[in-house]
């Protein structure tokens, strides 16, 4: 429950910060929200996240381990990377970037929860190996993307697309290799 509570806080506060930047590219200029109001709202979101995280741990229809929560962060990262792929070549403004990365991160969490967390109980070390598999796959995918693009433009959609596919493949291979216990 403690790890889920902290994760709930981090997700809620991160979401509040991203929504602040999605609504205004420079939220602290003279026309935007003042710093004290933003800090108060972000703190309130974090507090709400504590309760949401505890609630999630209590009502989840499956066993929830600390490793499962770490695996959700890996899914959030891959989801955000996939969203970055969709907008990388279009010169988006900062509001679009914040909204896309936020949505991609949340979709990554939902997909990871459905495919990995509900089915398996991950230990901390297994979750670390899953994350490492994702990083290794992303690096290999970036290499393929740079070779395919013929230039070292790391911000192109093609390169990020291959990195995302590599990360997904790395996570899948790590899951296959470690063979975590089925959900109890």
Identify what each model region corresponds to.
Residues 1-184:
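Hydrophobic alpha-helical membrane segments
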């Amino acid at each position: 429950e403690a790890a889920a509570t902290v994760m709930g806080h981090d997700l809620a506060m991160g979401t509040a910060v991203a929504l602040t930047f999605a609504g205004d590219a420079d939220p602290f200029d003279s026309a935007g929200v003042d710093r004290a109001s933003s800090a108060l709202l972000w703190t309130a979101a974090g507090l709400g996240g504590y309760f949401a995280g505890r609630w999630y741990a209590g009502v989840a229809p499956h066993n929830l381990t600390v490793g499962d929560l770490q695996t959700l962060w890996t899914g959030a990262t891959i989801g955000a990377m996939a969203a970055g792929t969709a907008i990388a070549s279009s010169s988006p403004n900062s509001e679009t970037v914040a909204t896309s990365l936020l949505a991609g991160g949340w979709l990554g969490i939902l997909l990871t929860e459905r495919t990995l967390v509900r089915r398996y109980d991950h230990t901390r070390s297994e979750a670390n190996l899953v994350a490492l598999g994702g990083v290794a796959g992303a690096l290999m995918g970036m290499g393929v993307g740079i070779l395919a693009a013929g230039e070292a433009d790391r911000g192109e959609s093609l390169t990020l697309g291959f990195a995302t596919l590599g990360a997904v493949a790395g996570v899948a291979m790590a899951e296959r290799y470690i063979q975590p216990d089925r959900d109890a």
